[in-house]
Amino acid sequence: MSEMEVMASIMRDHILALLKEGKRVDGRSLEDYRDLEIKINVIEKAEGSAWVKLGNTQVLVGIKVDMGEPFPDLPEKGVITTNVELVPLASPSFEPGPPDERAIELARVVDRGIRESGAVELEKLVIVPGKLVRVVFIDVHVLDHDGNLLDASGIGAIAALMSAKMPKVVYDEESGEVQILDEYEPLPVSKMPIPVTIAKVGGNLLVDPNLDEELVMDGRITITTDENGMISSVQKSEGGSFKLEEVMYAIDLALTKAAEIREKVLEAVGAE
């Protein structure tokens, strides 16, 4: 057994011993979220942006709005695309190069939560049906990784979208020209999907796992819900299995925590 495996085994035993007492390595209860900080409009040249600090995990999300062609099967809807960069300085496990499986999963979970909830009214992003629409780029940069990147990134994405403003455009049907005005309007955001992640460690379910807990967890489920209690995304990863009663408990916990997080997002957006 390598030194790293020995350390992981020791950490797992320590975490499991604490969990038997209803405690966690950082002093939280099983249902406690870490401290959450949100700041918006932190990138001057972006249409929208947000910085999120969840415990010691930090992410920066930027929104860029451009123009382009719609998807062929969705000619009357704008486009959303999500990218994630795992900055090597954020964690020793991150390496430079093309996106790895973690970055791809992270981007998909964030994208799906926003897209399936209908958070952005894509119909309102159409300039010329079938030809020209707004393209919204969501770029997530992980600055410091101490666990639960899924929630931090999803929270940052919706906060950045809610802060975003895009230049108004006028389309001249006769000339076919598009004029970009100096006036700005908010991105049409009508829902607030919030992801909440619950990890399973030794039969215990705990919300918002930190990095130590993620390294020894048996499984993980991320549930994204909107303010109406509708589920827009569920992502199970890292192996393991969840019983039906565990999934139902996770949904209830996700709804409760999402409501609390939503208030903090609204507070951050309203403070600007």
Curated annotation (Swiss-Prot):
Molecular function terms from GO: mRNA 3'-UTR AU-rich region binding
Highest taxon listed in the record's lineage: Archaea
A GO CC term attached to the entry: cytoplasmic exosome (RNase complex)
One Pfam family cited in the UniProt record for this chain: RNase_PH
Coiled-coil region list: none
Membrane-spanning segments: none
Gene3D superfamilies xrefs: GHMP Kinase, N-terminal domain
CDD domains xref list: RNase_PH_archRRP42 (cd11365)
Keyword Chaperone: no
InterPro entries, per database record: ExoRNase_PH_dom1 (IPR001247), ExoRNase_PH_dom2 (IPR015847), ExoRNase_PH_dom2_sf (IPR036345), Exosome_comp_Rrp42_subfam (IPR050590), PNPase/RNase_PH_dom_sf (IPR027408), Ribosomal_Su5_D2-typ_SF (IPR020568), Rrp42_archaea (IPR020869)
Gene Ontology biological process terms from the UniProt entry: rRNA catabolic process
Compartments reported by the entry: Cytoplasm
Family recorded in the similarity comment: Belongs to the RNase PH family. Rrp42 subfamily.
Function: Non-catalytic component of the exosome, which is a complex involved in RNA degradation. Contributes to the structuring of the Rrp41 active site.
Subunit structure: Component of the archaeal exosome complex. Forms a hexameric ring-like arrangement composed of 3 Rrp41-Rrp42 heterodimers. The hexameric ring associates with a trimer of Rrp4 and/or Csl4 subunits.
Protein name: Exosome complex component Rrp42
Originating species: Thermococcus onnurineus (strain NA1)
Lineage of origin: Archaea, Methanobacteriati, Methanobacteriota, Thermococci, Thermococcales
Gene: rrp42
